[in-house]
Amino acid sequence: MQFLKHDAELVRLLANCDSEVARARSNEDLLKVIDKLSAFKGGLEFDHAQSLVLLMLAIAAAVPAMAGVIPMVFVAACLGFASLYIWMSRKAAFDELPKKIARKCSFLSNGLWDPGGSADERFSQLSGEFDDYDRGNDSRRIEASAKGTFQGARHELSFVFHHLRYVNSHIKNKCDGESERVYESFDRFSLVVDFPWVKGVAVRSNLPDKKIAKRKVFETTFDDFNRTFMFCGDSELACARFATPPTLVFLLSLCQRLTNVNLEFSSQGHLCLSFDDAEVMAYQDPGTLEDLPGFYAKIKQGLKLPNLFPVLALVHELAELQDNNFELPLTVTDDMEQ
């Protein structure tokens, strides 16, 4: 039964490594995890012996079940399900570990950390402060978050990156007169930044699925801006102070850098910069556990986030445009109420 022992030891190793990755405080800690994987005797491959034994028992139970022995139908189904579940769960654990190591390495290499709290708690806080999280008529969830600081020439900006996944559903009519409910999953990304210089203003090129909170919509004297964005605010004064010509030019250029970009400045002094671009938090794939030497080398080198900090630099540029803005250099006219 040595093959059963090997699989059991590998399961324990992966679980232990998973815990150590979660506790890692440096890349050296992650390298120790990879060393432990390299030292494991017998190879990092499951024999799937337990799954195969259960599958054979399921096949054996299926013979009398096919002959009409009703209880054996239940036995065969349970054994078959158990075999599939064990095989899939072990494969998932093996595939997910290098992804978790890579993600933690990207955090440690770039001065990021987990913001704490549960995904539900984070979503509740964000959706209460920003309209952009009011998406998905079926479900919505924060998939991942990362906290950090960006040091610019003038300001240090505290930020949290969030990955929102939401699902829309609708009824689709088929040719035969029947109908079915169709589910579509979408991803939305955001940077929530401490931004005390602007409050109660929203600039949107992409509206959430549900109706946003009722606010006045304003127009500027920049036609290109008016065609690109919906500009809302708590007051005409707040909008006028925000909508300086350099700021409007900056926002038009930002729209070329990020897809479906929105900016919401909450009354609590936070900016939610949201967009559809997953590559903002992308890093080079270090590979899998099948090539441990190559995986080790890339983790040792560290995983950069080449697209995150340029976006944060843009947020800092906006802060520089707004941090001493107390005059009303641009006329903003009340256009309509939403």
Where are these regions (language model features)?
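Transmembrane-cytosolic junction motif
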Residues: 81-106
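Charged, low-complexity intrinsically disordered regions
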Residues: 119-167, 179-338
